[in-house]
Amino acid sequence: MTDVRDPDISDSPPQSMEALGFADQFLVWSVRVWAQSNNPDGTAPSHYYKLMREAFAKAGLKDTHLVFDRFMSLFTIALKRPLVFHAPNCSCLSRQELFSVRLVANAQNDMLPCALGNLETYIAATGVRPTMNALMEFSQDFAREGILLEQVPDLEGPENKFRPGALRGDMANVTVH
């Protein structure tokens, strides 16, 4: 049997930030900065908000940081599973960071049933609709500015398996390391 797959397309997930394209890196960095602003590290949260606001503006997304903040807030308030995000300058990738790339890519590519199903895996049913609305709004803003995310495979392995988590209404389910 002849292998007709494109040799430039990998079935394996990216293992580091460097393996991602710019749009994917920008989203992962944004998620990390947002998470860091909500997990005290001795730096004032306003520092991270300012950093994100400036980065979004430079990318042509002047007010999108507000919609992104709304999405992340709604998403984390309705969490039913713990999340792990790396520090903004870390080269590693977590399963949840790749999930965020796939989620936005699904929204940008009109794969809404897939995006909806993925959201339902992570958040309580009561949070799905408002979170999906915010996701659609900021992912369309990204697309209008040419920030198009790629479909990336999921990470596998025991270190990335979910731990059972109770529904939480705070940032206790979000870890930055």
Across the structure, where does each feature detected by a protein language model lie?
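Polar/charged low-complexity regulatory segments
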Residues: M1-V101, A105, N109-H177
